Structures are given as C-alpha cells and as structure tokens.
C-alpha cells in the first residue's frame, strides 16, 4: 500500500535565517498522527541563510544523517570533534548523551540546503561518532545500513537507506527488508509501482509511506533524485 504525503501537506517554517519543510512533527509544527514512522523520527529539508548556524544542543540517542544538497556545512561537538561536508556528501552523527552538537553554514554569500533524518539508535550499539560519505550520483547507491555494507555509513538501527538518481524513463527496483518504507523525492517527477500494480505519482518534495510490500519499482517521469528509507523496525 502506498500513501502519499505531498510537500504541501508538510509543516513549514520561515524564520528568515532558516526555511524548513517538516515531514513529521518538529519544533512548532505538531500533528499527533505524524510523530515519526517506525524508527524514522525526523525528515526535514532545511535551508540555512549565508553564515547562519544552529547553536550547540543535545539530542536523544539518535543517528542524524545530513545529506548536503547545496553549499557547505561545518559540524562541531562539545568533545572537540569537527568536520565539514559539502554538496554531494552525506554526514552521519552518532549522537551521545551529554554531548552537544552545532551546525554552521560556512558560506558568507550562499545558502546551505540539506536533508536531515533522525533515526532511533539501538542503545547497545556504539559506532564511530562521525562518518562521511561521497554520494555516487549513479542509478542506485546504498548510503547507510546496519553493518556498513558496500562501503555505506553504519547505522545503529536496522535501516537501509538508498540514494537514487534516474534519468527520464529509467527505472529502479528495490527488494524491501520489512513491512515499512518511506520514499522521499528530492527533485523530479516519478511514479512508484507495487507488485499489486498499485501506482502513485510523486513530484518534487513529495513523500510516500509504503506498507506491506515486498518490493517497489520507481519509474522516472523526469530526471529524478530521491531517497528510499527501508524501515523494518
């Protein structure tokens, strides 16, 4: 079953220095029916103005994945670690209790645009505090997984996350690990097909909940960039 969540249905924020779109309840935006999906707690697309920053703050025990779409960011923690990431890279922070984290748009004249996901972390798992990955702009790229398969970032949760880039008319098929998946369009138009021949059309910024499907096929109706988040738990 596919249930779409269009960009227009998402929460919105504009603070001047920050513009944001929230898939799930976040900050001032609250919907009791949308507190997350399985272990996916947050899925935001945010634009930080030139020179803007998120001041240091602590987090619940989550893995925070930032996919940089445009610009360059710097991340610091209270333990003295810091790393930079730019467009075409993904950065994973394995947050720790009592440690604060900040984010800064390094450019003085260019906005920073990124997708940010929070995933519940298994308390028994301890992974590297910071991991970075260059995105392969090919058809399919596994960018995060529980065991760091195929050179992907290693998560503290049973989640598989794919970065998808398709030309118009191309398709990609995914075998899913469990009953829940979330699909997020970054840009482009496409349709998703299930083995029950259910079809859903999505465009730039739209998302979709996928339930109880063994596999899913994506067909690009225009040049497409998207994320597929396979969430068995």
From Swiss-Prot:
One of its GO terms (cellular component) is cytoplasm. Transmembrane segments: none annotated. The keyword Cytoplasm applies. Induction: Induced under conditions that maximally induce expression of the large pathogenicity island (PAI) also called the locus of effacement (LEE). Keywords: Cytoplasm. It is found in: Cytoplasm. Its main location: cytoplasm. This is Pirin-like protein YhaK.
């Amino acid at each position: 079953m596919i249930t779409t969540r269009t960009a227009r249905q998402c929460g919105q924020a504009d603070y001047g220095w920050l513009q944001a779109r929230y898939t799930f309840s976040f900050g001032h935006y609250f919907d009791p029916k949308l507190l997350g999906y399985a272990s996916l707690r947050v899925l935001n697309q945010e634009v930080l103005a030139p020179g803007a920053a998120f001041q240091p703050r602590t987090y619940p025990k989550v893995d925070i994945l930032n996919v940089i779409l445009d610009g360059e960011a710097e991340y610091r923690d209270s333990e003295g670690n810091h790393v930079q990431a730019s467009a075409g890279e993904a950065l994973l922070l394995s947050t720790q209790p009592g440690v604060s984290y900040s984010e800064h748009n390094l450019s003085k004249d260019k906005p920073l645009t990124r997708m940010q996901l929070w995933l519940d972390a298994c308390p028994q798992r301890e992974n590297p505090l910071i991991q970075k990955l260059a995105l392969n702009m090919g058809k399919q790229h596994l960018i995060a997984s529980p065991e760091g398969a195929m050179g992907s970032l290693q998560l503290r949760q049973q989640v598989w996350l794919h970065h998808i880039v398709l030309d118009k008319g191309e398709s990609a098929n995914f075998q899913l690990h469990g009953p829940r998946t979330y699909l997020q369009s970054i840009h482009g138009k496409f349709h998703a097909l299930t083995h029950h021949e259910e079809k859903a059309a999505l465009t730039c910024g739209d998302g979709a909940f996928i339930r109880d499907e063994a596999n899913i096929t994506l067909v690009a109706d225009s040049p497409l960039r998207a994320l597929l988040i396979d969430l068995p738990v």
